[in-house]
Amino acid sequence: MEAYIRQKRATPGMVQASDLQLVRPMSAVNRNGREVHAYDGPMQFMMSPSNPDQIISSGSPTTVTATGTTTGSVTTTPTSPYSDATLEKLTPSSQDSEDEESTPVDILPSSNSFDRHSDGHLTHSAPISPALNNNVSRDSQQDSGSSGNLKSMEHSSPQASGHNDAEGDVAGPIEQWVTQPAAQGVLYKCRITRDRKGMDRGLFPIYYLHLERDYGKRLFCLAGRKRKKSKTSNYIISCDPTDLSRQADGFVGKLRSNVFGTTFFVYDNGKKDDPVSPRLDLAVVIYDTNILGFKGPRNMTVLLPGMTEDDQRVKINSSDSHGQGLLDSWKSKHMDNVVELHNKTPIWNDETQSYVLNFHGRVTQASVKNFQLVHDSDPDYIVMQFGRTSDDIFTMDFRYPLCAFQAFAIALSSFDGKLACE
């Protein structure tokens, strides 16, 4: 019988298990002489001496990319028409497709990387692939001027990966911690899970934010869900996952978009016309409009309130008739109390035909939602990064000056459909 089994296994028509497939839990014992591989991320597999796809190159780093992205023949420079007059002329285009935003990750050798502005490669809803290149070129950053009172950028750690940063934890009551700016020199690693089970959660899923701790433990922080009866996208964010309403005790704030889904506003739990506890602007997320339908990864601008010398946010109230909100200050170039962040431009890999970013092992799947936020004064200091690890699980890491609520709201804006952006 054993001889028959060995002969049958040697038959060319048999399908053998690939090393690149999803590894399921197995016993530590070798059965029938098979070598058992433990998967601990792309870098762990690539360092294996038995890697079948290993290609020895002269100093060329190995890059984990997502293939299948096609290139366009149009060379253009993306613009940012943010004025109200331009937004009124926008025509709706296609929305996000959950089937197109995630691509299996292949292990391929990297070639020379080019900035998509200089190389002219633009692809529709192009997924951004996680790369294992620790030396992301500064030349690939957007050359757009930004300012703002972000005094910690020049004194922050130069390591974009955050290996020198301490991992943060909750300090004090969770309701207060989620709105407090992150401590300097601390990296907060979080996970966002999307729950689409139930009658109406296919259209209105619930998003949960957990802070990751040692030994695989997680601490619940926030939950968010889009309101059903609203003319525009309106997300309620709360510390109470059982009561996602504005009247709940755990209500922290909300995320609201304009009609086209190009601009998102983040507010705290204050009331608009209440002089005692007025509603404050905590962030504005602006996505570049895509009038001509050119294809490529998203471009986004994030506006935050400036920071004081004692690491507290400047209070900005857009509902105050005597003051300016974040968006109005940005349009009028009054940036003294505004921090402007941009998404880090992914590098176009000509050989793999995909855009790549170095997420330092925190992102494992290509997605149009993957992004990193940086300040123009220090492109190596990643203020926030967000990316996909499975169909409904995403990682979200943030640093000073963001708080957990701001970072979670920015991530929620990436999930929302955008008529004029893609």
Curated annotation (Swiss-Prot):
Highest taxon of the source? Eukaryota
Q: Which InterPro entries match?
A: Tubby-like_C (IPR025659), Tubby_C (IPR000007), Tubby_C_CS (IPR018066)
* Family the entry assigns: Belongs to the TUB family.
Predominant location category: cytoplasm
The UniProt keyword set, sorted, is: Cytoplasm, Nucleus
The protein's matches in Pfam families, at most eight in alphabetical order, are given as: Tub (PF01167)
UniProt-annotated stretches for the region Disordered: 49-169
Is the keyword Nucleotide-binding in the record? Answer: no
This protein's name: Protein king tubby 2
Query: PROSITE patterns in the record, alphabetically?
Result: TUB_1, TUB_2
| Compositional bias annotation for Low complexity | 57-81
The answer to keyword Amino-acid biosynthesis applying to this record is no
Where does the record say this protein resides?
A: Cytoplasm; Nucleus
Organism whose genome encodes this protein = Culex quinquefasciatus (Southern house mosquito)
Q: Which GO terms describe its biological process?
A: protein localization to cilium
